[in-house]
């Protein structure tokens, strides 16, 4: 428009407005008298109104500069320029003294006002001290950990153990421990939280020192301070590791100024007065309009002002900004003047009016200020906004947060300002994710939660008790009314929080706008670059604390990002019918291998990226039409090898070759790629060339065109979204993927980053926040116990009644506080909407994994975190959100459960997945999955071939792989079917304090007969499956039980020593683990014998006899060790050492009994006789061990009576709640059978010559000879040996065959030959 050209002529590039000729020409636009009145109205001194028209000199643009200079003259400027003030020593600009020898112990920000602890207890002080007068400074608490804030003298000496307040003449307040410190310590003040502001006040006239928290005085902390010669006090702080604060000595306006106290750094008084007067002039322009027709001034509302390009107004604004622009670069003036003005604009009028005014103000800033000036101004403005938002107290209506967010949104709606802030400020200079965080109040009273939730309530029965199956107590009318009142209060709170959340989502929608591409890249593509770099810093810098975004910010950022992302996804679907809804979202698999998205140094499922590109280059060419240049691949490999040794300069100077369509495109290597932590991050993008062939069509060699994935920092809209010749992010589509796009490619990258963000820290934080709910349950249980004691306490014991009443009051007050805090946590973290966000991410990951799996070997390129997020998000929904909202109510819950079950069942033994950690996670997830009825039924619903494949993997031999979790899965499938195996907790642990009932190991038995049947079928069908599996189980049982016995021998010896000694808790834990493994292996054997008894009892099978003999040998060893009176096992069990709680007679003996009963009682007579003969033939068999099961020390002879025991004996008959009468009858039948059989075997046994015994076991006669070496042993020993080794036991010669050996026949043959 014409006015814009006129306004642009008044550029400040040379700080010269216009020529005199131009001025006289322009002033003729309006009547001279009207112009004079207008200028006097705009540039009136603030202390008096406009002078009478008759007594003033006419004012025009010619003499206006002199008038403005006079207006901006400040009388006290000379006094302020002196710098030194009585009572203060040091530089006028107060900062932290980073030269005091604290290097390495603390990390100080560039502005020397922020500090982060980097040692055990580091201390730092300011550069300025005070010795007289009243002074104050503020500390912005960024983390609520251990810190001591206060004052010290120059003679105080600190170290890693002693900080501010630990020496004489140093004084400190510690809000973490709620104490004050001066050599000694006493209670003082209130607890602080992240986002609070502590004001430190010192009155050296009265010799007192006090503190304020968020403007509220905590009272006098110290009196009678040492004063006089040589006594001057420095602001100082001591911080523990990772704690962080920021100081405000007066460089910015104090948030909570205290009357009579002066900041250590004086405000820029003269500039402040000038800026306020200029702001008044600017406001006058907004509220006064010229009416040239009527020749008068019209007063209007500033909220309705419109920039219409009037030359007189533009000239007036040019004169204002000529003086105003340099002032708006100073942080103090931006916060004190411009920020206050803009907040006032936002608070007045409607949001639309405020938005219009702010938008026009920003237009004026960009019009009348130099670019570097407006950029500095916007930078300071956003940093001030961030501080105001982050360190504002929580008020009942969240009004402060709403105002700051509305102003932030108004600024970001201005396109030019938004793009500048996105490119240079939001992610580069400050943590913009703070704008999406809603802090949790530590002090619910100050947050107004008492008024918002006047009635508190908490569950009167914990989730732990409900899972234990205890009957729910009927809810009384009073409890029901309290619960409903509490829920109404929670809803009121949630609605207020939703207002803030909606503003945050609107801000993110502005940042994700991709239609504002006038004059540069759209905001979304700038955001993508910064967002990826943000993820890189948090993924690659996990050991570098200052760079990491706090996880509580990440949680809120993730939820707002999901809302904005789904909005744009569904908006695109509305205009593109072939696209998909956000409910069907997933990440196409080609993004993982085409190099268009940077995954830094994150692990892939198949291992290192360089290894995958070498081994799978043929598959990339055939399935995705991507060809890897061998020379570039070799260069990338060598570059990986030399990376650690290569100096940074040479890395930065190394040329990066890139070939694009049309020829070579040299791209310089960005400097940040050369840093040690980030050097490996973009190796795929920076050194390897990718060749592209047109998708879905085989091309000749000449048609293959080498292309290069652009670096993340250099990508454009075309690089991401693609064009008619370029698929963008979707380069290299495999044949399994549909041709139509899901959505815009940029949204796919945002979704990928969101999944990565959940994996980085969100899941961990969700688990931490459950602690509030756990605290409520603990205190509720304590309150119930106290009330029960009060009811039972005799009235005559008034002393006990008084103590119980006091405890009841403490618990009730704590529960009131915690229940209100829990309402806040549920509204901000565990609400239904947040649950749906996590559920959506779970489904996204499931679909992504399913699509990636269809690509075959290319599945190995998928980053590990997709599987991790799928596992962890389900765990979060079940364990963190489950107590508040039911998972069963989620849409498509059953289908999702089944799809996750199919993924776990297929990939826990997937050879394409090589990472040990992710394989363990998959195994543990599957083990947990089969413990719960709902998820176990989901496993049973997956296709039959997948179920059979899963069971086949579970039955693979245990050697050469982690087997404990596999065995645990098989045990859970059997639990509830075994002998005496229907317990949830062991009988001897019932009286102890219950553990978390949500643990997988404490779930009620839920066996799967379907999966048991699959196991039986596989063991029957495969000739090699059963022997190899059972051989490995028997080997591991032998190892686990032997290790257990060896360890309890050491524990027993240590316990019997006279001198004081301690048993290592780790040794106790390993010992208990070996015992648990032994029990679980016995249960797997019991399941196998029950389901497929012929494996042991059908001696037509070549390995049955050998397996049965080995089983009998192990069972006898276990029985002998466990059942002997007052033996090693017995003594250790009676010690009841902490850590060995699970070690007891019952679990291991009932497992052995179940195996024996199945062998000796069930089945046809021929099979039981075979099992009996093998059991009795084992030299370790003792009938006494079998008698022990029923509490009988020895079999009774006729006519004798059982002697009176001197102590309680173990007996299965004592566990009637766990063992049925039918099972006990079977044990008695087995004992009778073995008693009779052992008597017959003893009568029929003949003495054996020692020379004829097997030289390996010395238990059985020699019955086999090895060929060709001729050594001999019994068949059982050699068969067992050959299961694992083909070399001779004696001479290590290779055994070709084993032949029967009969001494009598061979002796007669030798005699005949002689």
Curated annotation (Swiss-Prot):
Record has Calcium as a keyword: no
CDD domains: RING-HC_RNF123, SPRY_RNF123
Catalytic activity: S-ubiquitinyl-[E2 ubiquitin-conjugating enzyme]-L-cysteine + [acceptor protein]-L-lysine = [E2 ubiquitin-conjugating enzyme]-L-cysteine + N(6)-ubiquitinyl-[acceptor protein]-L-lysine
Segments forming domain B30.2/SPRY: 74-254
EC top class named in words: transferase
Zn finger region (RING-type): 1254-1292
Transmembrane recorded as keyword: no
Keywords, in A-Z order: Acetylation, Cytoplasm, Metal-binding, Methylation, Phosphoprotein, Transferase, Ubl conjugation, Ubl conjugation pathway, Zinc, Zinc-finger
Region (Disordered): 460-483
Modified positions (N-acetylalanine) in chain numbering: 2
EC number: 2.3.2.27
Pathway note: Protein modification; protein ubiquitination
Signal peptide: none
Alphabetical GO biological process terms: protein maturation; protein polyubiquitination; ubiquitin-dependent protein catabolic process
Residues that bind Zn(2+) 2: 1269, 1271, 1288, 1291
Residues that, per the record, bind Zn(2+) 1: 1254, 1257, 1274, 1277
Modified residue annotations for Phosphoserine: 675
Database matches in InterPro entries: B30.2/SPRY, B30.2/SPRY_sf, ConA-like_dom_sf, RNF123/RSPRY1-like, SPRY_dom, SPRY_RNF123, Znf_RING, Znf_RING/FYVE/PHD
Modification after translation, per record: Ubiquitinated, leading to its degradation. Deubiquitinated by USP19, thereby stimulating CDKN1B ubiquitin-dependent degradation.
SMART domains: RING, SPRY
Interaction with NFKB1: annotated segments: 968-974
Biological function: Catalytic subunit of the KPC complex that acts as E3 ubiquitin-protein ligase. Promotes the ubiquitination and proteasome-mediated degradation of CDKN1B which is the cyclin-dependent kinase inhibitor at the G0-G1 transition of the cell cycle. Also acts as a key regulator of the NF-kappa-B signaling by promoting maturation of the NFKB1 component of NF-kappa-B: acts by catalyzing ubiquitination of the NFKB1 p105 precursor, leading to limited proteasomal degradation of NFKB1 p105 and generation of the active NFKB1 p50 subunit.
Protein name, as recorded: E3 ubiquitin-protein ligase RNF123
């Amino acid at each position: 428009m014409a006015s814009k050209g006129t306004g642009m002529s008044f550029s400040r590039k040379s700080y010269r407005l216009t020529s005199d000729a131009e001025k006289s020409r322009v002033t003729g636009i309006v009547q001279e008298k009207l112009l004079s009145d207008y200028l006097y109205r705009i540039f009136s001194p603030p202390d008096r109104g406009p002078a009478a028209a008759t007594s003033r000199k006419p004012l025009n643009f010619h003499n206006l500069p002199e008038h403005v200079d006079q207006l901006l003259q400040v009388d006290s400027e000379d006094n302020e320029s002196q710098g030194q003030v009585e009572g203060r020593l040091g530089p006028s600009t107060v900062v932290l003294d980073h030269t005091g020898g604290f290097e390495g112990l603390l990390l100080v920000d560039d502005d020397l006002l922020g500090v982060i602890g980097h040692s055990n207890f580091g201390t730092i002080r300011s550069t300025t001290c005070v010795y007289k007068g009243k002074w104050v400074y503020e500390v912005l608490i960024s983390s609520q950990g251990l810190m001591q804030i206060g004052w010290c003298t120059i003679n105080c000496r600190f170290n890693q153990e002693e900080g501010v307040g630990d020496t004489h003449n140093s004084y400190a307040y510690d809000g973490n421990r709620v104490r004050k410190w001066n050599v000694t310590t006493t209670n003082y003040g209130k607890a602080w939280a992240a986002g609070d502001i502590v004001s430190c006040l010192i009155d050296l006239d009265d010799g007192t020192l006090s503190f304020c928290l968020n403007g509220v005085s905590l009272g006098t902390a110290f009196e009678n301070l040492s004063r006089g010669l040589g006594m001057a006090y420095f602001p100082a702080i001591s911080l523990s590791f990772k704690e962080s604060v920021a100081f405000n000595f007066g460089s910015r306006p104090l948030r909570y100024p205290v009357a009579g106290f002066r900041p250590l750094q004086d405000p820029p008084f003269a500039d402040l007065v000038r800026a306020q007067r200029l702001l008044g002039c600017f406001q006058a322009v907004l509220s006064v309009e010229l009416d040239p027709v009527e020749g008068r001034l019209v007063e209007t509302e500033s909220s309705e002002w419109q920039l219409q390009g009037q030359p007189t107004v533009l000239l007036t604004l040019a004169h204002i900004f000529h003086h105003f622009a340099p002032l708006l670069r100073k942080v103090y003036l931006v916060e004190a003047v411009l920020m206050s003005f803009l907040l006032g604009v936002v608070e007045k009028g409607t949001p639309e009016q405020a938005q219009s005014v702010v938008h026009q103000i920003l237009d004026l800033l960009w019009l009348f200020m130099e670019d570097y000036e407006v950029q500095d101004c916007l930078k300071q403005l956003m940093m001030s906004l961030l501080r105001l938002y982050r360190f504002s107290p929580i008020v009942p209506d969240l009004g402060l947060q709403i105002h700051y967010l509305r102003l932030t949104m108004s600024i970001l709606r201005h396109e030019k300002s938004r793009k500048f802030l996105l490119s240079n400020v939001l992610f580069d200079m400050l943590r913009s994710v703070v704008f999406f965080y809603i802090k949790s109040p530590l002090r619910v009273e100050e947050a107004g939660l008492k008024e918002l939730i006047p009635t508190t309530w908490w569950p009167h029965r914990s989730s732990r008790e409900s899972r234990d199956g205890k009957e729910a107590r009927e809810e009384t009318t009073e409890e029901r009314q309290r619960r409903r009142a509490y829920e109404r209060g929670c809803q009121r709170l949630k609605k207020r929080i939703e207002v803030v959340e909606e503003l945050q989502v609107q801000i993110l929608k502005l940042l994700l706008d991709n239609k504002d591409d006038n004059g540069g890249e759209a905001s979304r593509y700038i955001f993508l670059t910064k967002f990826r770099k943000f993820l890189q810093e948090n993924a690659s810098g996990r050991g570098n604390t200052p760079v990491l975004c706090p996880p509580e910010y990440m949680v809120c950022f993730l939820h707002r990002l999901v809302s904005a992302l789904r909005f744009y996804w569904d908006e695109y679907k509305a205009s593109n019918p072939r696209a998909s809804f956000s409910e069907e979202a997933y990440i196409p698999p080609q993004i993982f291998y085409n190099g268009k998205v940077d995954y830094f140094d994150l692990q892939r499922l198949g291992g290192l990226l360089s290894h995958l590109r070498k081994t799978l280059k043929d598959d990339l060419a055939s399935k995705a039409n991507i060809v890897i240049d061998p020379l570039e691949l070799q260069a990338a490999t060598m570059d990986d090898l030399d990376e650690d040794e290569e100096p940074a300069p040479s890395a930065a100077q190394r040329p990066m070759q890139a070939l694009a369509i049309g020829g070579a495109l040299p791209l310089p290597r960005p400097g940040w790629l050369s840093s040690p932590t980030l050097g490996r991050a973009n190796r795929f993008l920076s050194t390897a060339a990718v060749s592209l062939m047109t998708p879905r069509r085989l091309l000749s060699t000449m048609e293959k065109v080498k292309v290069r994935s652009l670096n993340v920092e250099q990508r454009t809209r075309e690089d991401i979204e693609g064009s008619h010749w370029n698929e963008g992010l979707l380069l290299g589509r495999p044949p399994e993927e549909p041709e139509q796009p899901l959505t815009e490619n940029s949204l796919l990258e945002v979704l990928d980053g969101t999944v990565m963000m959940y994996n980085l820290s969100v899941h961990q934080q969700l688990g931490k926040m459950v602690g509030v709910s756990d605290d409520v349950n603990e205190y509720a249980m304590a309150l119930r116990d106290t009330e029960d004691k009060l009811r039972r306490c005799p009235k005559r014991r008034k002393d006990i009644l008084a103590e119980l009443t006091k405890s009841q009051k403490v618990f009730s007050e704590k529960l009131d506080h915690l229940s209100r805090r829990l309402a806040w946590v549920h509204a901000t973290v565990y609400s239904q909407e947040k649950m749906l966000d996590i559920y959506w991410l779970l489904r996204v990951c499931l679909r992504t994994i399913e699509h990636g799996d269809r690509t075959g070997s290319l599945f190995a390129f998928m980053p590990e975190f997709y599987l991790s997020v799928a596992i962890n998000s389900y765990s979060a929904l079940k364990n963190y959100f489950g107590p508040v909202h039911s998972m069963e109510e989620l849409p498509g819950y059953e289908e999702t459960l089944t799809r996750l079950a199919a993924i776990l069942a297929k990939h826990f033994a997937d050879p394409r997945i090589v990472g040990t950690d992710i394989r363990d996670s998959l195994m543990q997830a599957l083990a947990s999955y089969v413990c719960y009825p709902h998820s176990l039924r989901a496993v049973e619903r997956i296709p039959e071939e997948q179920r059979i494949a899963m069971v086949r993997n579970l039955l693979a031999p245990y050697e050469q792989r982690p087997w404990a979790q596999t065995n645990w899965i098989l045990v859970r499938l059997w639990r509830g079917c075994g002998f005496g195996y229907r317990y949830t907790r062991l009988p001897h642990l019932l009286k102890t304090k219950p553990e978390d009932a949500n643990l997988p190991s404490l779930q009620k038995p839920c066996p799967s007969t379907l999966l048991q049947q699959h196991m039986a079928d596989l063991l029957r069908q495969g000739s090699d499956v059963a022997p190899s599996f059972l051989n490995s189980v028997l080997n591991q049982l032998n190892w686990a039980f032997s290790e257990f016995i060896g360890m309890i021998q050491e524990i027993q010896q240590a316990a019997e020593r006279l001198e004081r000694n301690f048993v290592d808790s780790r040794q106790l834990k390993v010992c208990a683990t070996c015992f648990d493994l032994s029990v679980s292996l016995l249960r797997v054997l019991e399941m196998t014998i029950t389901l497929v008894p012929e494996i042991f009892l059908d001696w037509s099978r070549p390995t049955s006899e050998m397996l049965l003999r080995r089983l009998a040998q192990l069972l006898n060893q276990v029985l002998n060790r466990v059942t002997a009176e007052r033996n090693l096992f017995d003594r250790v069990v009676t010690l009841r050492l902490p850590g060995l709680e699970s070690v007891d007679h019952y679990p291991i003996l009932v497992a052995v009994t179940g195996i024996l009963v199945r062998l000796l009682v069930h089945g046809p007579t021929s099979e039981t006789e075979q099992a009996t003969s093998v059991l009795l033939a084992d030299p370790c068999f003792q009938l006494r061990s079998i008698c022990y099961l029923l509490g009988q020390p020895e079999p009774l002879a006729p006519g004798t009576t059982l002697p009176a025991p001197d102590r309680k004996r173990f007996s299965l008959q004592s566990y009637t709640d766990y063992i049925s009468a039918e099972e006990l009858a079977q044990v008695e039948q087995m004992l009778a059978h073995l008693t009779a059989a052992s008597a017959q075997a003893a009568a029929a046994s003949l003495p054996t010559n020692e020379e004829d015994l097997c030289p390996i076991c010395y238990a059985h006669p020699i019955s086999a000879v090895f060929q060709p070496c001729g050594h001999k042993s019994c068949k059982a020993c050699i068969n067992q040996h050959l299961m694992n080794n083909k070399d001779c036991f004696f001479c290590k010669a290779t055994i070709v065959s084993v032949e029967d050996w009969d001494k009598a026949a061979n002796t007669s043959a030798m005699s005949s030959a002689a």
